[in-house]
Amino acid sequence: MKRFLIASSLAASAMALAAPSLAQDKAPAPAAAQDPQFSQPYIDVDEWRDAPVRHRYVHGGFKGTETLFSFYFPDKAHYQGRFFQHITPVPDNENLAQKMPMGEENKIGFSIASGAYFIETNGGGRDQVGMPGKPNDFTLAAYRANAAAARYSRVVALQMYGGKRPYGYAFGGSGGGFRTVGSIENTEGVWDGVVPYVLGSPMAPPNLFSIRLRAMRILNDKFPQILDAVEPGGSGDPYAGLTPEQASVLREATKMGFPTPSWFGWKTMGIHGFAALYGGMLQADAGYFTDFWSKPGYLGHDDPKVFDGYRLQYDSGVATPITALEAAQAKLNVSIVNGTKNGGVDNAFAALQGEEGRRIVAFRLTGAPPPVYFDGGDLIVQSGAAAGKRLTIARINDDIVILGVVDAAVAAQIKAGDTVRVDNSNFLAAETYHWHQVPPASDNYPEWDQFRTADGKPIYPQRAFLLGPLFTAATTGKPFGQPPMTGRFHGKMILVENLWDREAMPWQGDWYRKRVEANLGAATNDNFRIWMTDHALHGDSAQQEDPTRTVSYLGVLQQALRDLSLWVEKGVAPPANTDYRVEDGQVIVPATAAARRGIQPVATVSANGGVKAVVKVGQPVHFTAKIDVPSGTGKIVSAEWDFEGAGTFPVKAKLPAPGARVVLSVSHAFSKPGIYFPALRVASERDGNAASPYARIQNLGRVRVVVE
């Protein structure tokens, strides 16, 4: 596949596309070579706007391509010579930032408050999504479209502000983390540094979703007791009371890196990104799904009875197709994600659904499939214009099958009267795909050692190739057959991972760190940091799934960008790496802020002196909290109590002057019996600015109270 490699030695005047030659930094970054496919930029909107703050909005694209961009420039008084560029998980929309509310989530407001202009693009266009087997040049979406926008933004910025070459920093999470890493590894002189976050590894897709599918099905009714064991004041033994099969599945998922406390979302988290990966998986390795049920060494062949009561093969007819407009009118939820599609890491893949009102999103069948546990399947068309085709089913609602990520043209061919089969056989087969994807031991994936014999050989038959690296290469823009992520880059990087992340298990950040260390050696500490965020999930949004359990990590990302710019521009080293160890797939951090390091505060809460208190109705419980910030990383600016699980944190603690250590004490009585998990949410800010909505680093402390 043809690739345009980004060179590192072209003069700045050539990059500037006929812009005037301007003085550069004393030690300038290498100039970014012009990509010939993006040689004709144009601007179709150029205007000043007042929301969320005063800025100049510039929209345009590149002739001969589908790439579109938006630039958001502050006035000269607020510009400090840099830009921040967000990279979405998949090619999306260049106007996403305009839809974000005021406050912490607003990328335009944050960038301008940080002296930067902001860049976003459509990633080259929706048609450029990288998947194995797609005919398009996946380097466009991986990094070239974003690089072209970054290069051209400097032309516009220099014309507006004059002065020196703007420094540039990119950030992106999940699939956008892959694209961010690919961007810095494949180029030189475009970005001076990057902040990838919730980053996976080349072995992540689809394997870290397949183990999740299996665990969700087999442990479905056991999660309440598993969670109770690992909650504050619990037994600490999540395996107690499980059958041998259930214990084996939980142990397997845990060793693969799934954070046990994060199973609290078992009812709502669904299959997540597997909805987008399944189509590529089926295209690249279709034989697996027949081998699974027909060949020795595969669970479906060797022990098919374990799927009794779960396997669904239901023949029916189509009563009527349902369009997106009709679904909305009937208040039928057909989204494959919870919440709004805004390019965030928890929902960007849903953009692949499309949005047109006439798009077919579901079918009403002539009968309702029998009720079984169902986390996805196929609608196999047996007659009509689409005979022989299959569409992914996200879920079943009585006699309505709701589609997942599908080919809209195929869905439109299916008419009333066509015969179809609802079949979840492939999704059941996918549950153990990771058994048959054991990487070489030299690739440093100890999480797969559980699928090897004592002499290091795979226990199960292996597929002809490893699928994960193919998916990843299509996202990072590396040639197939070469390492998708090398750890070799020019610039500086701060990597942010989350300890409760159930989509990108945090051990993968350590995997990439080892790649960086192998390439940079003694220079690693001068160019790389990794920060782990406790109580944080995958999604990059201010509102998290359960606020009494989890916190937003947006403040960590924002501080990482600010620290990165100081590191590059002024030589000010950022705070140290989080101290951690990886043990059986789990990332474990020290209990105190001083030992943990990184930038996140640590809140230690007690109830009547312990992690668990047992009291009578109306009897006051005495809560104490010690809050510490790692040295030199900020001051505590807020502390909020939520005693009864409302998720609103209604009790605001009165703080002394902002400081790096705070001790709190409060009492609360419960009016009803039950089990409560009171939580204290705290936030630090680098300068102790309690009024700023940005770069507030959050954490939680929790205890258990049993009221009799």
Task: Place the predicted regions along the sequence by residue.
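C-terminal His-loop and adjacent cap/lid subdomain of alpha/beta-hydrolase
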Residues: 24-640, 646-696
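Short beta-strand elements
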Residues: 692-708
